[in-house]
């Protein structure tokens, strides 16, 4: 009885010490695979993606896939679409998302407008700026930044 108690206590002590140690560092491919799986199942701003991106950023701070993932996450998280009533048949180059009739049988147009949370948008821009700094010859990163800025400014191109 005493031997089995000691064996059980020893087993628990070894188990807890193993849990207390940091898990081994994942490779870039493992992070990328996990990120792709989460985005595929939960969308670009799903639960757990921010935590994964933070861990990935600590282990590989200049990884392009991680930086683009952060940009996508924070940009998606910052975007808040809403319907607004506007005069005219087009707004910022877009057709109305919804058209209703008022009491005088006139068309009332509603357009989808994306508003952005300033802090989350700033984090997205910081991520894409870091990606541009790491790989200045990648034009796609510059185009992502330009598109995000145009969207946030609500200017018709």
Which positions does each model-derived feature cover?
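Sec-dependent signal peptide cleavage junction
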Residues: 18-50, 57, 83-98
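Residue-level recognition of tetratricopeptide repeat
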Residues: 63-66, 136-141
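Short coil/linker segments at helix-helix boundaries
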Residues: 29, 73-130, 134-137, 144, ...
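Repeat-mediated protein-protein interaction surfaces in helical alpha-solenoids
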Residues: 46-54, 122-129
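Structural register within alpha-helical repeat arrays
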Residues: 34-38, 56, 70, 77, ...
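Bacterial Sec-dependent N-terminal signal peptides
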Residues: 1-28
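Conserved structural position within tetratricopeptide repeats
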Residues: 40, 55-59, 126-133
């Amino acid at each position: 009885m005493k031997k089995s108690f000691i064996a059980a206590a020893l087993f628990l002590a070894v188990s807890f010490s193993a849990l207390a140690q940091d898990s081994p560092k994942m490779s870039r491919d493992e992070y990328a695979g996990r990120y792709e799986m989460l985005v595929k199942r939960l969308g670009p701003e799903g639960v757990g993606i921010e935590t994964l991106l933070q861990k990935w950023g600590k282990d590989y701070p200049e990884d392009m896939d991680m930086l683009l993932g952060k940009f996508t996450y924070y940009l998606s998280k910052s975007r808040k679409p809403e319907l607004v009533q506007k005069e005219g048949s087009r707004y910022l180059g877009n057709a109305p998302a919804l058209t209703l009739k008022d009491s005088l049988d006139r068309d009332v147009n509603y357009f989808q407008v994306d508003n952005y949370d300033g802090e989350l948008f700033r984090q997205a821009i910081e991520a894409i700026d870091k990606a541009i700094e790491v790989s200045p010859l990648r034009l796609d990163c510059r185009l992502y930044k330009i598109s995000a800025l145009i969207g946030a400014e609500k200017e018709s191109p």
